Amino acid sequence: YLVTDNVRLQQVVNNLINNAAKFTTYGSITFGYEEDEDPEYTRIFVEDTGVGISEEGIRHIFERFYKVDNFTQGAGLGLSICQTIVERLRGTIFVTSEVGRGTRFTVRIPNFCE
């Protein structure tokens, strides 16, 4: 179990799921958690089989106002806000992706963060 700011963590997860839904017309979205190599941490992930993000996009994905395209709604702030929240929870967020195959966002946070 996690002892953390549940409201903020839920905000992060909701944003990641909404982003996955925005870029996954066909396929699936998976949400879950897994043990970390360090037993003091947990990893939460949102994975999709959507369009994927280019290497260039990955380099900028957490920058404020960055959008991978100009066709979708949003101001390009969501992932930047997610990163700020995760860092305040003393965690990290990272992304792996392959164009045409999908994307996985992973949040690694300590089990106890008050």
Located regions from the model:
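Short helix-loop "hinge" at the ATP-lid/N-box region of the Bergerat-fold HATPase_c
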Residues: 20-21
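Short conserved segment of the HATPase_c
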Residues: 53-65
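Acidic ATP/Mg2+-coordinating residue in the GHKL
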Residues: 48
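Short beta-strand/loop element within the Bergerat-fold HATPase_c
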Residues: 28-39
